[in-house]
């Protein structure tokens, strides 16, 4: 939608109104009213735009308009209404009959605003502030607290070897530990936690140095000898098992031969019985 042409291009006048123009406008409005400000200049025969006619009537030519300065009561009313309505000048003018919104706005900015000691202009809203940001000091405190809690948690979950055997000057209790050696016996470690003393471990406890010194060549020889004996025994068992299997096969073969021989003897006895004996058999031959 394009912008309407200005008054000069339309052949309309601009500038101050003449008394003749004021008389024409007042007479037309009193007779016909002002239902349509855009069509009013043409109907009234004025070379003015509708906006100029409206402002001239509302601010100067209207019969009930008050002339002169604002009274003390009107100024107090403007201040109280401005605290409630703000810069809604037309709404304030509706509460003050005979005063226009333009006059009220002018008197506020020129006189009334300066009289207010506690007046503070509205600060522009800054929409560039990031939500959820914390002050720098609070962020530093929270980060230091988090690192401190993490370090305390690491110390409590992963104690070092020095902390196990370290002694505090405020405790004097006796603690004991039990270690299991390689041969199944248990040895106790007594630690006397006295102020200013270093905890000592009994010489009877098993350490890596004494354990290595107790192992000599005889230990390794006995171990190897026991392994050799185990291998010899296993070999003997394997040989004995093979011999037993061989004997079982031999016994099975001899039993089969006996069964075959017995079956052959039965066959010939049966033949002799059918032919009538050995003599008949020889005679037949």
Curated annotation (Swiss-Prot):
Alphabetized Pfam families for the sequence:
Myb_DNA-binding
Give the matching CDD domains.
SANT
The alphabetized list of GO BP terms reads: response to cold; response to salt stress; response to water deprivation
Q: Where do Polar residues bias regions lie?
A: 139-158
- GO molecular function annotations of the record: DNA binding; DNA-binding transcription factor activity
InterPro entries under this entry?
Homeodomain-like_sf (IPR009057), Myb_dom (IPR017930), Myb_TF_plants (IPR015495), SANT/Myb (IPR001005)
Question: DNA-binding region at which residues?
Answer: 37-61, 89-112
The tissues where this chain's protein is expressed are given as: Expressed in roots, leaves, stems and flowers. Expressed in stomatal guard cells.
Q: PANTHER family recorded for this chain?
A: MYB FAMILY TRANSCRIPTION FACTOR, TRANSCRIPTION FACTOR MYB15
How this chain assembles, per its entry, is: Interacts with SCRM/ICE1.
- More info: Plants over-expressing MYB15 have improved drought and salt tolerance.
The protein's name is Transcription factor MYB15
Source organism (scientific name)? Arabidopsis thaliana
